[in-house]
Regions:
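A conserved amphipathic helix/loop scaffold
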Residues: 8-169
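Aromatic-Pro/Gly-enriched surface loop or interdomain linker
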Residues: 1-3, 120
Length: 169
């Protein structure tokens, strides 16, 4: 099976999706979800009770609001440990952390210091939540670290040019 599953901007959850994710993480999988996920059901009706719908316990948080930035407006996400920061634009989701641990926080605006990325241990696995539409370098570096920790080996050791995808079967 898969060691890591990435679900970016998974706006709509089809029936049964939450249970599949729950079992995957409980059994040791690594799940990565981003902002604007679990907002509606398969009928495009808003999920009641909070988002990400049906996975708040797995993710260890509840979304409270999302700040849509104007064109050209940016914010910063800063690592909780270390001196690393990245720019973000378009979307900055605010979350209320329950059991998740912040890995990155926002650096500016009224939500400075609030989580921009979290990790939650659930069962035998981990669930990561990316709250910000950060620059590509953020995703390259963070995903590389998560995938390595999960024990996924790269098919090629050298850098892969932009626009090229490498997969193994």
């Amino acid at each position: 099976g898969y060691k890591v599953v990435v679900a970016p901007m998974l706006y709509m959850f089809r029936a049964g999706f939450e249970e599949k994710v729950r079992k995957f993480v409980e059994n040791g999988g690594t799940f990565i979800m981003t902002y604007w996920s679990g907002v509606v059901d398969e009928n495009d009706l808003c999920v009641l009770g909070g988002t990400p719908g049906g996975l708040m316990d797995v993710m260890g948080l509840r979304s409270t609001e999302i700040d849509a930035l104007y064109d050209g407006e940016t914010n910063v996400v800063k690592a909780v440990v270390g001196d690393v920061s990245y720019q973000c634009e378009r979307f900055c989701q605010l979350v209320d952390v329950k059991t998740a641990e912040p890995l990155f926080v926002y650096g500016e605006d009224f939500y400075a210091g609030t989580p921009a990325m979290t990790v939650n241990e659930f069962g035998k696995g981990k669930a990561y939540y990316v709250c910000a539409d950060a620059e590509q370098k953020f995703f390259d570096n963070v995903y590389e670290e998560i995938v390595t920790k999960a024990g996924v080996e790269r098919p090629l050791k050298q850098a892969i040019p932009e626009g090229i995808e490498v997969s193994t079967r």
